């Protein structure tokens, strides 16, 4: 124990305002005071090219009622959050364990959130007004009227490999297995 309360994760390519960490801390505290078991709080990623939020409806559980948490931001409970800029209490790692390093680059944050929920009942949240500029992959391409984030071949390899590894774990949600199975299959053949 080094005397720290939280670990702040930040990607090198995410752009945050000065107040993002304060918002994460404030909202974590409000969730805790409402007796909600918190695993992680994260930011709402905004696509730097389009200015639109990255939203995955199948990942979102519910918007937390403002009556439950007074003096907070809009908070969305999710099955998992991106670690691009996120905050996790140090003591939670003693309960859940660390990130699965064998996954290396893709799915690491998702797997940790799913494990925290399944094994420990710890929940993950997005603080909606804690926005960051972010870019998934190297840009977007359309595939049958749907935008698909394009990744380098190196990254696609790890996405597909990690998808296969994660499909074997019983705590990984079925919706994620179905959705990403199709997506990664298409990426293998359609995108360079």
Positions of predicted regions on the chain:
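Non-catalytic, C-terminal membrane-associated alpha-helical segments of glycosyltransferases
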Residues: 168-192
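A recurrent flexible, glycine/aromatic-enriched loop bordering the glycosyltransferase active site
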Residues: 68-88
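A short, conserved alpha-helix in the catalytic core of glycosyltransferases
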Residues: 86, 92, 96-97, 102-130
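Active-site donor/metal-binding and catalytic loop motifs
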Residues: 127-147
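Short glycine/serine/threonine-enriched helix-capping/active-site loop
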Residues: 38-44, 127, 135
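Short beta-strand-to-loop element that shapes/binds the nucleotide-sugar donor at the catalytic cleft/hinge
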Residues: 41-53
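Short beta-strand-to-loop acidic/aromatic patch adjacent to the donor-nucleotide binding site
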Residues: 4-15
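Acidic donor-binding/catalytic loop of UDP-sugar-dependent glycosyltransferases
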Residues: 14-27
């Amino acid at each position: 124990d080094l005397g720290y309360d939280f670990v702040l994760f930040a990607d090198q390519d995410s752009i945050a305002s000065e107040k993002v960490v304060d918002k994460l801390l404030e909202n974590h505290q409000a969730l805790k005071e409402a007796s909600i078991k918190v695993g992680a709080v994260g930011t709402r990623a905004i696509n730097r090219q389009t200015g639109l939020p990255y939203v995955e409806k199948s990942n979102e559980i519910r918007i937390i009622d403002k009556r439950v948490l007074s003096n907070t931001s809009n908070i969305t409970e999710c099955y998992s959050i991106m670690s691009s800029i996120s905050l996790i209490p140090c003591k939670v790692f003693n309960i859940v364990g660390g990130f699965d390093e064998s996954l290396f680059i893709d799915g690491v944050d998702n797997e940790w959130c799913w494990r925290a929920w399944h094994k420990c009942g710890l929940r993950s949240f997005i603080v909606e007004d804690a926005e960051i500029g972010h870019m998934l992959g190297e840009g977007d391409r359309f595939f049958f009227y749907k935008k698909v984030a394009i990744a380098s071949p190196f990254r696609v390899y790890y996405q597909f490999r990690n998808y296969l590894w994660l499909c074997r774990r019983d705590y990984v949600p079925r919706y994620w297995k179905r959705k990403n199975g199709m997506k990664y299959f298409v990426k293998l053949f359609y995108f360079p």
